[in-house]
Amino acid sequence: CWDKDILDYCGISEMNLGKVSWPATIVGEVSADAAKETGLCAGTAVVAGSADHIASAFSAGISKPGDMLVKLGGAGDILCCLDNLEVDERLFLDYHVIPGLYLINGCMATSGSIIKWFRENLAGDFDYEELETKGENIPAGSEGLVLLPYFLGEKTPINDPKARGMLMGLTLHHKQEHIYRAILEGISFGFLHHINVFKELNISPNSARLTNGGARSRLWKKITADVLEIPVEVVSNHPGSSLGAAFIAGKATGVFSSWEEIDRFIEIGETIDPDPEVSEIYKELFCIYREIYKRNKDVFEKLWEIST
């Protein structure tokens, strides 16, 4: 299962690596020594799990082809379930925990972390609720502000570590609430960029589920629906990857008999539908968003050279 070319390039022997196993495979048991160190019972099954983002998607109900998850966390993850292999260098591709399924996915290096940075450095005395309320009173498009959310470079889909964050269109008219809304819109444009790549691969999700801290933001949820032009379902009380990992262990040890039983632990809250008129505004702004990056790519390269 290990890639020989990569191992040879790194000078690593396959003998030094563990055996690759499918999720929900019992690969051993807790030894007596490990039991003393951890407090677990000796003989407890040790089960192969999955990557955290895969377990998190599974535990949000992303388990049928076309299901899509948008994670509004410190970074921004977007995952779509497939029953066939679609390989594209702009995206990541992982096995699902369910045999025969895959998760094509992307990760934006910064998402909610930009909001945290703004709140701590530029928002003055405003708390998050005040920013929400004021941001809701700003029209879609933030009155001419467009943000590139590349504050740590960017992973997918542009794969450009030299890209930088950018706020285009500032005037003396703009206030903190304009910038706050522009941040949410810029992050949502990043997710839309991923969906456009999905569509190039003939993957067309028609709805999305939202999780993580950003799913508690009234404004961010609404902007996400309007920018993506699809209904978004909010997963309530989602514990993240821990639920997925626990279920995988339970499936391996006979607590659960089918993968579908995960559904009984998933609670869907509100569903937010896009506003067609607002979506039209965002379509035009997304084109500008993409143009800003393309026209400044060489500038980002020069800034990289100066700062390193």
What are these regions (language model features)?
Residues C1-C10, I26-G28, A32-T308:
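Active-site core segments that coordinate phosphate-bearing ligands/cofactors
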Residues M15-P23, I104:
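A glycine-/small-polar-enriched, mobile loop at the entrance of the PLP active site in fold-type I
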